[in-house]
Amino acid sequence: MSMELFEVHEGKAKVLVPKAKTIYDSPVFYNPRMAPNRDVVVLLLNVLKPKIVLDALSATGIRGIRFALETPA
């Protein structure tokens, strides 16, 4: 089974997401409307500098990928 993919650029992250008519039709859930929320969380993590962060509701994993790329180790 082949899927048509498109590349999403968000912050420093680049991920491939299946094309779908709606976000609910895709086998992988990616909600582009939440990008501003992820931007704010990355900014907050850079200010608070927690030692551990959990992305418990991961779908595409973009939030966790951004945490890894855009916050201090």
From Swiss-Prot:
Keywords: Methyltransferase, RNA-binding, S-adenosyl-L-methionine, Transferase, tRNA processing, tRNA-binding
GO terms of biological process kind: tRNA N2-guanine methylation
Chain segments annotated as transmembrane: none
Domain Trm1 methyltransferase, first and last residues per copy: 6-73
A Pfam family of this chain: TRM
The protein's Enzyme Commission number: 2.1.1.216
Protein origin, superkingdom: Archaea
Annotated Gene3D superfamilies: Vaccinia Virus protein VP39 (3.40.50.150)
GO MF annotation, one: tRNA binding
InterPro entries on file: SAM-dependent_MTases_sf, Trm1
Reaction(s) catalysed (UniProt annotation): guanosine(26) in tRNA + 2 S-adenosyl-L-methionine = N(2)-dimethylguanosine(26) in tRNA + 2 S-adenosyl-L-homocysteine + 2 H(+)
Function: Dimethylates a single guanine residue at position 26 of a number of tRNAs using S-adenosyl-L-methionine as donor of the methyl groups.
Family: Belongs to the class I-like SAM-binding methyltransferase superfamily. Trm1 family.
Protein name: tRNA (guanine(26)-N(2))-dimethyltransferase
Organism of origin: Pyrococcus woesei
